[in-house]
Amino acid sequence: SYPINLKNFPRGEESLKATIDKCHAAGLKVGMHMLTSFVGKNDPLVRPKPDPRLLKDAEAVLAADIDAQTQEIPSATPLDQFPLSPAFYGDDRQGLDILIDEEIIHYRQIDHQGRKFLRCVRGFAGTKAAPHKAGAKIHHLVERYGCYLVDLRTSLKDELAERIAGVFNRCGFDMIYFDG
């Protein structure tokens, strides 16, 4: 949702606009740089309840009931489509975060049989650790540069575009660079 950094701009858009106005008064142009369709793990779209319109790719099925403390998550289906490395850059599936119901879980590895997520951190990214029933869907959250991505087939892309355009226009930016 691209919230304004209140550490740097304590009054939100008002502070941001004041900074841009000072730059303009000094004869400078001001640009906005962003990673397009990326959502930070500390964003309100992630915590405390993940927005269902975050991009997911691999899917599995929970093999057994688990409680909120379980650190080995069993799958009834093979996990060969789930990544084994953290997210950086590239076209391959990356990132080690899964979504079950409304809980994000970070896994550190997959067992040799490819049927369990191991060394899991429950209630990851500000979500709440919770019990889950066998048969629940396990979704892999697509990640790049430590951020989740927006599913561009959903209305979330339009909401974020409106948010970004609104801040751009209200604060008086001169240009925007869409990265990523």
Language-model-detected regions and their locations in the chain:
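Compositionally biased, intrinsically disordered low-complexity regions
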Residues: 14, 33, 97, 116, ...
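Aromatic-lined carbohydrate-binding/catalytic grooves of carbohydrate-active enzymes
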Residues: 1-59, 142-180
